């Protein structure tokens, strides 16, 4: 019997998912949570075979929970189930050791099949996301990524020069190049584009 844990902040969807998966002969739902913090503590205590998690949840996101579980050496396999087909989220989920990343508009049978595959050690990802990852190659150099990451944190040009030991002119040139490469209006928009695509 595959032991499942579901974390989803929409109560109705949480209940529906639990009921539908409980109908599968080889699955049982052993726990549920409406936020990421509850999910983290319960998963560490219950050690389910598979955790199905939304990304956008109160207190902690599903991605944050997945990262914490990996740090703590938890053996439960994580499947991210979300409405967000963003390569940035997908890449972060893969780095956090997620065994699956599926979109909520899929069929319950597809989710059940994905759960069975994950238990066998396979990884299951939404085709839309794998296509996006192949299509969108990061155009930024390592240094440009570093500078844009700092800019995304709200650092000024002066802050960046002090942190990276570069002149203000050099940093301005890098930022100008980044904005041009990403076809953005300013550094804020450039950071937003890069974050969404998983480039920084």
From Swiss-Prot:
Its main location: cytoplasm. Member of the two-component regulatory system YvfT/YvfU. CDD domains: LuxR_C_like, REC_DesR-like. This is Uncharacterized transcriptional regulatory protein YvfU. Phosphorylated by YvfT. GO terms for cellular component: cytoplasm. Residues 3-119 form the Response regulatory domain. It comes from Bacillus subtilis (strain 168). GO terms for biological process: phosphorelay signal transduction system; regulation of DNA-templated transcription.
